[in-house]
Amino acid sequence: MAPAMEEIRQAQRAEGPAAVLAIGTSTPPNALYQADYPDYYFRITKSEHLTELKEKFKRMCDKSMIKKRYMYLTEEILKENPNICAFMAPSLDARQDIVVTEVPKLAKEAAARAIKEWGHPKSRITHLIFCTTSGIDMPGADYQLTRLLGLRPSVNRFMLYQQGCFAGGTVLRLAKDLAENNAGARVLVVCSEITAVTFRGPSESHLDSLVGQALFGDGAAAIIVGSDPDSATERPLFQLVSASQTILPESEGAIDGHLREIGLTFHLLKDVPGLISKNIQKCLLDAFKPLGVHDWNSIFWIAHPGGPAILDQVEIKLGLKAEKLAASRNVLAEYGNMSSACVLFILDEMRRRSAEAGQATTGEGLEWGVLFGFGPGLTVETIVLRSVPIAGAE
């Protein structure tokens, strides 16, 4: 019996490593420019009398390195829901009504773009991983997206709620395991984030909440992951070489979020950038030891841009050249911090800028790369990537 069982297990598994086969992104149409945002935010929350706090918020926005963000919440929606604009008003029902509907809708746009780039019928999707920080409901956003896209009822679904900013790495780790352990699997991975649950008015006694109001934006990203790609019809973008998760030492309470009647509250300690930069070298050494890589300027970088201070301190700690974090900084500038969706936007940015610059590979001409997710815990996801040659590149 044992040999037959081994043969069955072998047949169930893919032969090669998982790869990203397509990427799609989407944002709400409502763009908010960071230079104008303090005036807008204090006006819409009826907080213009807090002049000193407004000046602090302006400085936060100026230092954020963000040019614009996209938000589902328009001025009209906020005027219709004044409790969302308060700091401590019961408003969870109104917030839930928005995100339960809009998170899957935004996800559908990104997923449709990824499926179109992939070029295969959606009936070939075997698994769906859906991640969002907001809008817990039953049946969940994974079910709603299955219905919106018209996926097969037998698609195997996984739903991740309220993981936070590290979860763009989590979904890649799960997708890798699914693709490599199920021959022929094609995994649709979607992160969809809408700030309607975290938006709230300012408070002089809670400046950490104000930091979140200066950074977060809305966006959805989708990827298709599979092993053993069809060389005639599928074009891999990146291979997923390894994936790991760790909780950083002495970091408990550094980033917290709590779902309450007033919405999803956000708490942030000042030393988050320091905690990440202090521990990132060990994460890299553990991940790249099997490859014999220890020059962090010889790899391409996709780092979750929680804020500019995190990127700055990582850059200094590791002695990275300025261009190493350019893709991460550009996504932060153009979209803000979109929580779990951010690293997938950066993955898209990386392959596009590599092609436009005539680079030899999808990873800025380099072979190996790293994707980092940072978030509550402090939790770090470390994904080792391998780029692929760009067709027609010199």
From Swiss-Prot:
This protein's record includes keyword Acyltransferase: yes
EC primary class: transferase
Domain of life, per lineage: Eukaryota
UniProt KW Acyltransferase keyword: yes
UniProt xrefs under SUPFAM superfamilies: Thiolase-like (SSF53901)
EC number annotated for this UniProt entry: 2.3.1.74
Pathway annotation from the record: Secondary metabolite biosynthesis; flavonoid biosynthesis
Alphabetized Gene3D superfamilies for the sequence: 3.40.47.10
GO molecular function terms attached to this record: naringenin-chalcone synthase activity
Catalytic activity: (E)-4-coumaroyl-CoA + 3 malonyl-CoA + 3 H(+) = 2',4,4',6'-tetrahydroxychalcone + 3 CO2 + 4 CoA
Signal peptide: none
Organism this protein belongs to: Bromheadia finlaysoniana (Orchid)
Disulfide bonds: none
Protein name: Chalcone synthase 8
